Amino acid sequence: MPHTKASPPPLLQVRGISKQFSGVVVLKSIDFTLQPGQVHALLGGNGAGKSTLMKIIAGVLPPDSGTIEIDGQPCLNLTPAKAHQLGIYLVPQEPMLFANLSVQENILFRLPKHQADKKKMAQLLQSLGCHLDLAVNAGSLDVADQQLVEIMRGLMRDSRILILDEPTASLTPAETNRLFSQIKMLLQQGVGVVFISHKLPEIRQLADWVSVMRDGGIALSGATNDFSTDTIIQAITPQAKNSELTDTQKLWLELPGNRRSQARAQSNQPVIQVCDLSGEGFAHISFEVRAGEILGLAGVVGAGRTELAETLYGLRPVSGGKVMLEECDITAMKTVNRLATGLVYLPEDRQASGLYLDAPLSWNVYSLTQGNQGIWTHPAQEAAILERYRRALNIKFSHLEQPVRTLSGGNQQKLLIAKCLEANPLLLIIDEPTRGVDVSARSDIYQLIRSIAAQHVAIIFISSDLEEVVQMADRVLVMHQGEISGALEGSAMNVDTIMHLAFGEQTAFGEHHTDAHQRAENEGASC
């Protein structure tokens, strides 16, 4: 959007930005504009170049060519410190906090004294509707609260250009609405917001302007209301995409059968029985999951879902109750023994807990099973394993020794799934598998999960995206304040019912809810 002498220049004007890594072109002469008081949404598939472009604007990476202007003034040799001085702040998709510092120390870190105003910080927190304990260590926060701390760091720096990379990926609907209210207040003050998201309804709700990146270029750009949802999706993934895995992919994905057999699956015996289990953040939880079943676990942030998953995996202590895996009592087992028995956990935060970002791809996939192979590496075996999962999961990478951190978010998530599958699970606990993943990669991951379940693996599927819980799960348990507030199956499995139960509204939801809840109670009594 060019400006004239009568109109003020754009807040941010990017012209002809290009970038290569090791001879591979990742940005091709990008033009991008942000006006004061505007939300400019940026979409694109994983690897489209969104993060690279934003890192250049934030001074993290230098461009190979092109210019960046703020208020019409060219910015040369931009660095993160200089970007902060100019009012540019990038809130990353994966929170980058100091785990051993308090929330307050993280928010005020490296702020000049004249900006380190605790009263202002308290006012901002109140306006966001946040109830963060400023004294606790940031490492103790869940991902949603860590994201809010990152946003607070930007707001405390009086940012005029706020880059939000998937800011709502781990937020509840209520937290998302509060964030949007705060963004709208900032817009009235002339702040411009670059909003990176894969959630099209949010973009429709918030963004004035939308740009779609594909293969390092701009495939579509204009006023949001000028484009239909289908047009935007087509710009992201123009090729007609088959939603089913090919027979070849299914063959490559076939898991070893020593832990799962047709006879065992047909016996209808539960793979896992959780009996009146209590631990940090939850109490008196009972349920069963059978071979080939996908059990959805829904609830708002803080409901205790991740705490329950980590306790089942042995990362947190049990304070009461029992866990049986195929009639073997694993309640007192260490994590390594649970893993060896067939209980595998895909964590919520792939970068902090799931993958070794600076290690090679092949080593990451092999890492869960290395304890069974001794201390020596097996390059040929690692290469063969990675190649199998590359074909099965369509993981895109350049070479085997490539560090994980160089992959896009969707490919990192597929690599984490490969790592979990190589451990040969009986029960796979999947926590937020599509957080920060684009539309195309989400479809891939859904099909992968269904294919895994079809091989008689029991799956516990945890997600804050209630629509995908309904889409993926055979049954749904809803948690509220650490307890099961409802069990749903059949026609009772819908977003509205789950939302009511997630907020503790114990209204009668019909016979499917009643029968399913009674079933959950019976499962606890059967241990």
From Swiss-Prot:
Subunit structure of this chain's protein: The complex is composed of two ATP-binding proteins (LsrA), two transmembrane proteins (LsrC and LsrD) and a solute-binding protein (LsrB).
Entry binding sites for ATP: G44, G45, N46, G47, A48, G49, K50, S51
Known role: Part of the ABC transporter complex LsrABCD involved in autoinducer 2 (AI-2) import. Responsible for energy coupling to the transport system.
Presence of the UniProt keyword Transport in the record: yes
Reactions mediated catalytically: ATP + H2O + (2R,4S)-2-methyl-2,3,3,4-tetrahydroxytetrahydrofuran-[AI-2-binding protein]Side 1 = ADP + phosphate + (2R,4S)-2-methyl-2,3,3,4-tetrahydroxytetrahydrofuranSide 2 + [AI-2-binding protein]Side 1
Superkingdom to which the source organism belongs: Bacteria
The name this protein goes by in its record: Autoinducer 2 import ATP-binding protein LsrA
Listed GO CC annotations: plasma membrane
Residues annotated as domain ABC transporter: 12-240, 266-506
UniProtKB keywords: ATP-binding, Cell inner membrane, Cell membrane, Membrane, Nucleotide-binding, Repeat, Translocase, Transport
GO molecular-function terms, A-Z: ATP binding; ATP hydrolysis activity
Keyword Transmembrane attached: no
Species per Swiss-Prot/TrEMBL record: Yersinia enterocolitica serotype O:8 / biotype 1B (strain NCTC 13174 / 8081)
Membrane topology recorded in Swiss-Prot or TrEMBL: Peripheral membrane protein
The EC number(s) this enzyme carries: 7.6.2.13
Name of the gene encoding the protein in the UniProt record: lsrA
